[in-house]
Amino acid sequence: MNEQKVLLPRKATVSRQTKETKVEISLDLDGTGESRIQTGIGFFDHMLTLMARHGLFTLEIEAAGDLEVDSHHTVEDVGIVLGQAIAKAAGEKYGIRRYGQIYVPMDEALALVVLDFSGRSYLAFEAELGQGRVGGLDVEMVEEFLRALADNAGITLHIRM
């Protein structure tokens, strides 16, 4: 019986609307790596596109927020909704290994990411990213995105860079 459950589609569509944002995300964990990302924040879109491509899941994100103020609400709410979509699509987690880890060397950076898909959320984030903006993304929002993602997906996430 468990083998059949692995074959069920692991997909989710989740939306969230607040005074500051409107976010809708569709996720297929067994996708192709294709994505359509529109948050209004160029570098954030780029990073989410790479997440889908390298994770081999299909991801659609449509987000509108109060970017004239700053990127905080949009970035955090995308993390919340993506985390909820991951939890919903994973369901009872059939076919998903609980633990995972990877080292990724990219240009001058070396990142270590370790996760536990335990149902208990926690973020340990050790990275000196500095301050400022990259492609419209406030650098300090990276940690807020990851925290919202971990909290809402129910994962323990350790990142060192």
Question: Language-model segments: which ranges?
Answer:
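N-terminal intrinsically disordered, cationic/polar leader segments
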Residues: 2-161
